A protein has these predicted regions:
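Beta1/beta-strand and adjacent pyrophosphate-binding region of the FAD-binding site
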Residues: 8-22, 41
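Short beta-strand to alpha-helix junction loop
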Residues: 155-164
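Dinucleotide-binding Rossmann-like beta1-alpha1 core, especially the glycine-rich loop
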Residues: 53-143
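A short N-terminal beta->alpha junction/helix N-cap motif
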Residues: 15-18, 48-56
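Glycine-rich FAD pyrophosphate-binding loop
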Residues: 31-53
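A short, Lys/Arg-enriched amphipathic alpha-helix followed by its capping loop at the start of a domain
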Residues: 14, 26-38, 64
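Basic/polar N-terminal segments that are highly enriched at the extreme N-terminus
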Residues: 1-9
């Protein structure tokens, strides 16, 4: 049996069924990474409209857009997007509680020991503030502040700002 596919068996056409964000992002990614010898077609229903709930992403969208050579400023402007520093969970744990899961780094490692190890030990002793208090993104979100990460100073806490 021949394990090498013959030219007639080679896939040359790709059909993506379903539009929306997932369909169009898939089509964009495949068209970027596959050679021009592939035909990519997206099929979406005219009967199914836009959901209209707003789109939300996580920080990995920056890597995705970068892989597609999309300029972040232009992307945000043309999509009328905004920046998100984290996700807030209202009534988290019990009514009245809220928790912001800030994107980016939480706390600062001390030597070879990760921050969360110190926090956990202090938390077990009843001496730690809530974990999100150690997130620069959470503080910024609570005070309606935003800036991009300072990438030229890797040891600065401002280098750890994560956003979407």
């Amino acid at each position: 049996m021949n394990a090498v596919p013959v030219e007639a068996d080679r896939v040359s056409e790709i059909v993506i069924v379903g539009g929306g964000t997932a369909g169009w992002m898939t089509a964009a990614a495949l068209s970027k990474v596959l050679s021009r010898s592939y035909s990519i077609r997206l099929v979406e229903s005219e009967e199914i409209g836009t959901v209209g709930v707003g789109e939300a992403t996580i920080p990995m969208i920056k890597l995705f857009n970068s892989a597609l050579d999309l300029d972040e400023n232009q992307f945000v402007r043309e999509t009328m997007g905004s920046f998100k520093l984290g996700i807030e969970f209202v009534n988290w744990g019990q009514l009245g509680d809220s928790y912001i899961h800030g994107f980016g780094k939480i706390g600062q490692d001390l030597g070879l020991v990760p921050f969360y190890q110190y926090w956990l030990k202090m938390h077990q002793a009843g001496k730690a503030a809530p974990l999100d208090d150690y997130s620069i993104n959470t503080h910024a979100a609570r005070h309606n502040r935003f800036m991009r990460a300072v990438t030229d100073r890797p040891n600065s806490p401002l280098a750890a700002i994560g956003y979407d």
